[in-house]
């Protein structure tokens, strides 16, 4: 069954330069309305960030697609997501790789995301309630790390959990941020500015 809203979104993403078919297919298959409140459902397929409670947002689809594409994922990539949020970005990743590890500092958001993923029969995800600044060392090192909140500086713990040749996509800055692509080469980390973005802040610590 076709979804005209999803068709329009995919056409917009392609016109915006997204070309990885796996990313486009993952976004097309996912019912974005399942990740927002009932009051926001009519905007689910718009290219906008939407509030999900607790001062957090679900990122605009273009940013989800762009960040995912930049990771250059393979099916066996070991992936860490910092900031589970609604679980939408998590679900996109889970359709491309065998397993996703995701850390969320707000307990209620973590539980809501787990429930949504289960309802959509997405089981190849492990979530953890914890401090995103610290990553998830026990499950590393990672081929890819995606950070869905803005850090004032790149957390050292996340750099150390990146595999040789691994990539991290992270927004860095205060009000307006640079979206950085960081690649590990030995003990060097090569950083490229992708574009300017706006994300909620990556807050240290966890919240019950």
Curated annotation (Swiss-Prot):
Disulfide bonds: none annotated. Its EC number is 2.1.1.77. It is found in: Cytoplasm. InterPro entries: PCMT (IPR000682), SAM-dependent_MTases_sf (IPR029063). Transmembrane segments: none annotated. GO terms for cellular component: cytoplasm. Its main location: cytoplasm. CDD domains: AdoMet_MTases. The keyword Methyltransferase applies. GO terms for molecular function: protein-L-isoaspartate (D-aspartate) O-methyltransferase activity. It catalyses: [protein]-L-isoaspartate + S-adenosyl-L-methionine = [protein]-L-isoaspartate alpha-methyl ester + S-adenosyl-L-homocysteine. The active site is at residue 59. SUPFAM superfamilies: S-adenosyl-L-methionine-dependent methyltransferases. One of its GO terms (biological process) is methylation. Belongs to the methyltransferase superfamily. L-isoaspartyl/D-aspartyl protein methyltransferase family. This is Protein-L-isoaspartate O-methyltransferase. It comes from Vibrio campbellii (strain ATCC BAA-1116).
């Amino acid at each position: 069954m076709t979804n005209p809203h999803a068709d329009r979104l995919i056409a917009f993403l392609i016109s915006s330069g997204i070309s990885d078919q796996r990313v486009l297919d993952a976004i097309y298959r996912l019912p974005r309305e399942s990740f927002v409140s009932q009051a926001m459902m009519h905007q689910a397929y718009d290219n906008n960030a939407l509030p999900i409670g607790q001062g957090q947002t679900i990122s605009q689809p273009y940013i989800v697609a762009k960040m995912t594409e930049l990771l250059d994922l393979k099916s066996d990539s070991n992936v860490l997501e910092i900031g589970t949020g609604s679980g939408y970005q998590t679900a996109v990743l889970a359709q491309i790789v065998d397993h996703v590890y995701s850390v969320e500092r707000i307990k209620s958001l973590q539980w809501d995301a787990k429930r949504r993923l289960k309802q959509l029969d997405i089981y190849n995800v492990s979530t953890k309630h914890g401090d995103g600044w610290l990553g998830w060392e026990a499950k590393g090192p990672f081929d890819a790390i995606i950070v869905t909140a803005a850090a004032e500086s790149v957390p050292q713990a996340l750099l150390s959990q990146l595999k040789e040749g691994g990539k991290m996509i992270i927004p860095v800055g205060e009000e307006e941020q640079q979206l950085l692509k960081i690649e590990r080469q030995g003990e060097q980390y090569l950083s490229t500015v992708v574009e300017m973005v706006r994300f909620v802040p990556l807050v240290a610590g966890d919240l019950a």
